[in-house]
């Protein structure tokens, strides 16, 4: 139609879209205004992309342009409309712009420049009213085209594009996904941040040689998202001209290998992929988990995928983006120097909490749409902060995204609970179906018809109620709050929910009182531990160190291990959170390696360390090193970095975090002297000076047996004293409570008088063995007798047993459940 050489998109705008717009508005000829409307229809045109980059609202531009153009009331015109003289002038101006840019074609960008050079008319007025200036537009077009004077338009190809057919890529279509197409179709999640990494990828891809980037980072930090971000930038034309027409395809290597039964099939597939990339010349291939190239498809006498791709990569015939973890890169790729030099590494670090919050805010819309919920700002912040604090061995933003995803899923499932009314109706319909089946078998068709009608009525009723319920649910807006995120973390990590709630501070304030209910005596020990724990939970501890580290000194049976068990249940809500390591198992030097795992080549290497594996699985726990003086001295050397840095490297090279553990070390050093310093097995009243002397002696004993660098890293050294008589009575009450709990099923209750308790103490307590001797005394004096009487039938279910003292023995009386019958039996 025109003597000028137009690109395919420019032809389509003038000859198709502009014609359609003129006919739609009942105009009798095509004007520059119709051409501008046509440009807006061609979403992939460079002109449209320039307007979008300049923040021009295309919908508003279209509305203002249409409102400025008067729609004719005449009859619609059919056939091809003539063009106004202004269109000829527009194309002449566009040709001048093309010549100024040393282009041998007229593209949509030149048409847009020509419209702004008109300096009159509706199209010009609307464009300028939107803030568009000729100079700014020309500069932006030059930026997108790259260097001025280029003879190749990256967005709208020259006559070569018009004449050459699109290269077919059947193998790639089968084994790869087009990320640029997915970005164009809005099928990818938004990529927030990572501007530096994306620009580094663009820089490497724009190199002349060795233009293959490889993304290195821990799992979940967003390596694949960077490639998706590149695809989005290509679609938005926010890349240099050399990349504007590129397609980013992600290759599924497992699919390439799958189904290759015979020798040569895999090699043929790889060869076809390379040939198709060469022919297309606009494809960037992305291979996730690049280390799988090493050895992929390799057999005896055959090449693997990596060796087949090396020549093409070195000559720059194909461009490849790789992604893998740092460990896999070292293990597989670094060993192949020829492959390493063909890729340029880009380190992808874990984003900060602030960046993660920004990422979550950017992508939450997709999850809100999927789960039909709304995420509050508090929930988004909690997902980033709490996932960083409580979920280990995974990385942001992946673990935070998983949290909001699962919280949305959980809320949706809670709201979708099927009402009991529906279940009852379905059950009734099922029963009627069974009844109808029996009636039909008996050939009573009249009753069967009645049952059928009843079933139909019930099904209609159920359908209406379900529809009503669905409509009501859609009206309800479900909000994901901070507590929902905490519940999900509790389910993932097995940390009790109360541990995650803010009410924990109230529990910590009353910590001593709660511990005293289960641990008798040892006020100094409980007070010291409570203060240390409060310091750490208030944020006053060094971030990397454990929550607290203590050495418990004292004779056996005074409550060292008992306090550790109670403390683990108080802090972590679970008695199983106690990791108890008996140091008598580590008396030999070679046994020390069992804590962190056997070295390579030794038995048990794959099993990991006895300490490190347990802490990896339960990072919130209390670690009890029982009777450390029995262990080999090298054990204390291993504990040095745990106490100071809060981490330990296991035999696999993994760093295990101890910053959320409490470490308690027990020892019996100086126990004999502590016992000797007590009066008659009980602490003497007013013996504070003696207690201090005993403590100082025990500490001196500790210094003689352990290195200063070990003791210097401990938060507090606590000396447990022997128990007073009142303490022993409290312990008997606790043991009696446990005994009554054991026989609770038979409704039997045992009561002890004060005299009976004194008898147990006099008979059973030995200051050398502590409170454990009381347990043996209760077993011998009470449990043995009661068990015998139960077997003889003298004590029945529901009886109450009262135990008292009579001179040198205990007497037992029974309160029967039906009638009271007293028996007094002497036990010598």
From Swiss-Prot:
One of its GO terms (molecular function) is ATP binding. Residues 4-147 form the Clp R domain. PROSITE patterns: CLP_R, CLPAB_1, CLPAB_2, UVR. Residues 426-461 form the UVR domain. ATP binds at residues 217-224, 554-561. Residues 172-419 are annotated as: I. It holds the Pfam family AAA_lid_9. SUPFAM superfamilies: Double Clp-N motif, P-loop containing nucleoside triphosphate hydrolases. Keywords: ATP-binding, Chaperone, Cytolysis, Hemolysis, Nucleotide-binding, Repeat, Toxin, Virulence. The keyword NAD does not apply. Residues 480-671 are annotated as: II. Transmembrane segments: none annotated. Coiled coil: none annotated. InterPro entries: AAA+_ATPase (IPR003593), ATPase_AAA_core (IPR003959), Clp_ATPase_C (IPR019489), Clp_N_dom_sf (IPR036628), Clp_R_dom (IPR004176), ClpA/B (IPR001270), ClpA/B_CS1 (IPR018368), ClpA/B_CS2 (IPR028299). Belongs to the ClpA/ClpB family. ClpC subfamily. Bacterial hemolysins are exotoxins that attack blood cell membranes and cause cell rupture by mechanisms not clearly defined. This is Hemolysin B. It comes from Brachyspira hyodysenteriae (Treponema hyodysenteriae). The lineage of its organism: Bacteria, Pseudomonadati, Spirochaetota, Spirochaetia, Brachyspirales.
């Amino acid at each position: 139609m025109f003597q000028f050489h137009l690109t395919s998109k420019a032809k389509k705008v003038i000859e198709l879209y502009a014609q359609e717009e003129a006919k739609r508005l009942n105009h009798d000829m095509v004007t520059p205004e119709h051409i501008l409307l046509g440009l807006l229809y061609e979403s992939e045109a460079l002109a449209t992309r320039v307007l979008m980059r300049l923040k021009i609202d295309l919908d508003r531009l279209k509305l203002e342009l249409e409102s400025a153009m008067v729609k004719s009331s005449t009859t619609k015109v059919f056939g091809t409309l003539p063009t106004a003289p202004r269109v000829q002038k527009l194309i002449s101006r566009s040709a001048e712009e093309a010549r100024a840019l040393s282009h041998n074609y007229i593209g949509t960008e030149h048409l847009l420049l020509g419209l702004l050079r008109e300096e009159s008319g509706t199209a010009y007025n609307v464009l300028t009213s939107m803030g568009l200036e000729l100079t700014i537009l020309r500069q932006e077009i030059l930026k997108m085209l790259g260097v001025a004077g280029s003879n190749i338009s990256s967005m709208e190809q020259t006559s070569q594009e018009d004449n050459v057919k699109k290269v077919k890529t059947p193998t790639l279509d089968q084994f790869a996904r087009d990320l640029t197409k997915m970005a164009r179709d809005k099928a990818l999640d938004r990529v927030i941040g990572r501007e530096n990494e994306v620009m580094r990828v663009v820089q490497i891809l724009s190199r002349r040689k060795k233009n293959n980037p490889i993304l290195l980072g821990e799992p979940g930090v967003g390596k694949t998202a960077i490639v998706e971000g590149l695809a989005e930038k290509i679609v938005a034309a926010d890349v240099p001209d050399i990349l504007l027409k590129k397609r980013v395809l992600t290759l599924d290597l497992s699919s390439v290998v799958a189904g290759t039964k015979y020798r040569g099939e895999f090699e043929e597939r790889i060869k076809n992929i390379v040939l198709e990339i060469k022919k297309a010349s606009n494809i960037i291939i992305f291979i996730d988990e690049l280390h799988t190239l090493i050895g992929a498809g390799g057999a005896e006498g055959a090449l693997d995928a990596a060796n087949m791709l090396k020549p093409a990569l070195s000559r720059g015939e194909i461009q490849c983006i790789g992604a893998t973890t740092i460990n896999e890169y070292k293990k597989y790729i670094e060993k192949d120097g020829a492959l390493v030099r063909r890729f340029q590494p880009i380190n992808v670090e874990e984003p900060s909490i602030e960046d993660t919050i920004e990422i979550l805010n950017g992508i939450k819309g997709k999850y809100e749409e999927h789960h039909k919920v709304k995420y509050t700002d508090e929930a988004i912040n909690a997902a980033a902060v709490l996932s960083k604090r409580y979920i280990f061995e995974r990385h942001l933003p992946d673990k935070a995204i998983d949290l909001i995803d699962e919280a949305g899923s959980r809320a949706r499932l809670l709201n979708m609970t099927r009402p009991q009314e529906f279940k009852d109706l379905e059950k009734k319909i099922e029963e009627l179906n069974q009844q109808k089946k029996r009636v039909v078998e008996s050939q009573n068709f009249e009753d069967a018809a009645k049952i059928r009608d009843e079933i139909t009525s019930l099904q209609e009723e159920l359908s209406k109620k379900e529809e009503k319920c669905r409509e009501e649910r859609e009206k309800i807006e479900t909000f994901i709050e901070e507590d929902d995120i905490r519940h999900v973390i509790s389910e993932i990590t097995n940390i009790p929910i109360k541990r995650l709630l803010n009410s924990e501070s109230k529990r910590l304030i009353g910590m001593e009182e709660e511990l005293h209910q289960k641990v008798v005596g040892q006020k100094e020990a409980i007070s010291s531990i409570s203060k240390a724990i409060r310091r750490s939970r208030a944020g006053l501890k060094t971030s990397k160190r454990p929550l607290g580290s203590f050495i418990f000194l004292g004779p056996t049976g005074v409550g060292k291990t008992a306090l550790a068990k109670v403390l683990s249940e108080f802090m972590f809500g679970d008695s199983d959170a106690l990791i108890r390591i008996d140091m008598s198992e580590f008396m030999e030097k070679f046994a020390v390696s069992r804590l962190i795992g056997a070295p390579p080549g030794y038995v048990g290497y794959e099993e990991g360390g006895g300490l490190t594996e347990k802490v990896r699985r339960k990072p919130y726990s209390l670690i009890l090193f029982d009777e450390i003086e029995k262990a080999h001295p090298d054990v204390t050397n291993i504990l040095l970095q745990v106490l100071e840095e809060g981490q330990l490297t296991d035999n696999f090279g993994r760093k295990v975090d101890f910053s959320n553990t409490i470490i308690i070390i027990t020892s019996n050093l100086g126990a004999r002297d502590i016992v000797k310093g007590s009066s008659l097995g009980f602490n003497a009243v007013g013996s504070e000076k003696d207690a201090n002397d005993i403590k100082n002696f025990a500490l001196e004993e500790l210094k003689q047996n352990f290195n200063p660098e070990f003791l210097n890293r401990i938060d507090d050294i606590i000396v447990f004293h022997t128990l007073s008589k009142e303490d022993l009575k409290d312990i008997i009450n606790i043991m009696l409570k446990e005994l009554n709990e054991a026989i609770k099923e038979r409704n039997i209750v045992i009561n002890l008088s004060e005299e009976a308790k004194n008898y147990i103490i006099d008979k059973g307590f030995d200051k050398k063995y502590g409170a454990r001797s009381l347990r043996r005394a209760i077993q011998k004096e009470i449990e043995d007798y009661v068990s015998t009487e139960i077997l003889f039938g003298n004590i029945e279910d529901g009886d109450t047993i009262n135990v008292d003292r009579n001179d040198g023995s205990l007497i037992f009386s029974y309160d029967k459940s039906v009638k009271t019958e007293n028996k007094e039996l002497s036990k010598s």
